[in-house]
Amino acid sequence: EKKRVLELLEMVGLPEAALRKYPHEFTGGQRQRIALARAVALRPKFVIADEPVSVLDLSVQAQVLNYMKRIQEQYKLSYLFISHDLGVVKQMCDELAIMYRGRFVEYGDRQDIYLNPQHIYTKRLLSAIPNLDPGNRELHKRLRREIESEYKQSMESYLAKDGRVGDLIPL
């Protein structure tokens, strides 16, 4: 058993000394890596990752996502990756399903969703991805304002008469 625990710690980049630490002695990123090791300890084929990096800063997010990808390749497992951050989702997922108010509103491969979003909620999520290029900040702000305006003007068309999200319609 200890051999397996050491293997799992190594898999997520933690030293053997981590065995002797209390939970409060780990950073947030280390805790997420431990959670990842626990999730794959029994060698599952499928892991549900619900907002796995949402509370982490960007550099630590990248580390955890890299460990997740490496483990995915090593164990040939699939993730159901749940997140509001489509910038993170883009790095992790080949296929996406967008949910709004508890219903699927859009489904497609990564390229379809990112290059040609159909639902206004998808457009809003995409516009929330920070643009790090200072030369494009004004353009990004303008696009966000346009999407917000479209949302306010047309949101009713995305809802059924009872106020629920309409059915998912294939394109």
What does each of the following model-derived ranges do?
Residues 110-171:
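Short catalytic/signature loops enriched in Gly
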Residues 89-91:
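A short, surface-exposed alpha-helical micro-motif characterized by mixed small hydrophobic
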Residues 104-108:
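ABC ATPase "signature
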Residues 22-26, 30:
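Conserved ABC ATPase signature
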Residues 36, 64:
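Hydrophobic anchor residue at the start of the ABC signature
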Residues 41-45:
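A short, proline-enriched helix->beta-strand linker immediately N-terminal to the Walker B motif
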Residues 2-17, 126:
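Conserved ABC ATPase "signature" region
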